Design a protein with these regions (language model features):
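Histidine-acidic metal/acid-base catalytic patches
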Residues: 1-30, 93-95, 119, 151-173, ...
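Active-site-proximal loop/turn and secondary-structure-junction residues that shape catalytic pockets
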Residues: 10-12, 38-40, 63-67, 102-105, ...
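Generic structural signal for hydrophobic
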Residues: 26, 51, 85, 89, ...
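Short, conserved active-site loops that position catalytic residues or coordinate cofactors/metal ions
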Residues: 29, 56, 60-66, 100-102
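Conserved beta-strand positions in the central sheet of alpha/beta enzyme cores
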Residues: 35, 60, 98, 136, ...
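Glycine-rich, proline-tolerant flexible connector loops at the mouths of alpha/beta enzymes
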Residues: 35-53, 101, 108-109, 144-145, ...
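Active-site acidic/histidine proton-transfer and metal-coordination neighborhood
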Residues: 53, 72-170, 180
Length: 256
């Protein structure tokens, strides 16, 4: 059976005043995993307690600090933060950390920024080795949500991962961002499914609940799983209707 992870930055936010309570709400909705973005602004003790209480998994979080890896001057600060992020991931049982490339910086050429990104990820792979945690580089759309971001192409993201050439480094494939950029899943992922460490879904337009837009998310997930993807699917959407019943309906519609 497919496994789904609730991004509790958005899901259950209306009913869970305390962030850790959103973990309990996700568990009550029948989900077996949650994910979130930054960890440095969270009460990790409260999160750990909720995880232990519910026996729910934390599927992933952001590798902090979220600074531009396209700037070579940021590499050492990012590696220091990566070590700290790995320790937090291990404490919470998370298997995936998410990295963003950073902005497309005008003071550097595209080639220079790519080289900086590859260098940071290569060094990061050494830090990750043996930790049980993988890092997913996430392409984001630059048409709506992340204007000025360096990495909007899934294929380029995969090419960067292949240039690094380490099992510790893969990509996060966000179906919403990919669709906004006009990509077809089979065209950009075909033959390289093993590089995908995590998947995100939301519908378009609006980045809302699956089924409210024009992306056939069930079809795209069917294709990904048929190719051999065996990880969790992160529900990273802005819910029109929050709560357990709405989330259960979404999971069912996506093959859960």
């Amino acid at each position: 059976m497919r496994q789904f992870s609730a991004c509790i930055e958005w899901l259950f936010a209306r009913d869970g005043d305390a962030f850790a309570d959103r973990i309990r709400l996700a568990h009550q909705a029948g989900l077996d995993a949650v994910e979130f973005w930054h960890w440095t602004n969270k009460d990790l003790d409260a999160i750990a307690a909720a995880v232990a209480e519910t026996d729910i998994a934390v599927s992933g979080m952001v590798a902090e600090p979220m600074i531009a890896l396209t700037n070579p001057a940021n590499k050492e600060a990012w590696l220091k933060g990566l070590r700290e992020s790995i320790a937090v991931a291990q404490r919470l049982g998370a298997r995936v950390l998410i990295a963003q490339a950073g902005d497309d910086l005008p003071e550097f050429s595209r080639a220079e920024q790519r080289a900086a990104l590859v260098a940071a990820l290569s060094a990061g792979a050494d830090v990750l080795k043996g930790s049980g945690v993988r890092l997913g580089l996430e392409p984001l759309n630059t048409k709506i949500d992340h204007v000025g971001y360096y990495l909007s192409s899934t294929e380029e993201g995969l090419d960067i991962v292949d240039e690094v050439g380490r099992a510790e480094i893969g990509i996060v494939y966000d179906v919403y961002h990919s669709a906004v950029m006009g990509e077809k899943t089979e065209d950009v992922i075909g033959g390289r499914i093993d590089r995908v460490v995590h998947v995100h879904v939301a519908d378009h337009p609006g980045r809302g609940d699956p089924g409210t837009g024009h992306i056939d998310l069930a079809d795209r997930l069917n294709w990904l799983f048929a190719q051999g993807y065996d990880g969790r699917v992160g529900l990273e959407y802005r819910p029109r209707t929050d709560g357990a019943e709405a989330v259960r309906a979404v999971v069912k519609s996506l093959g859960g």
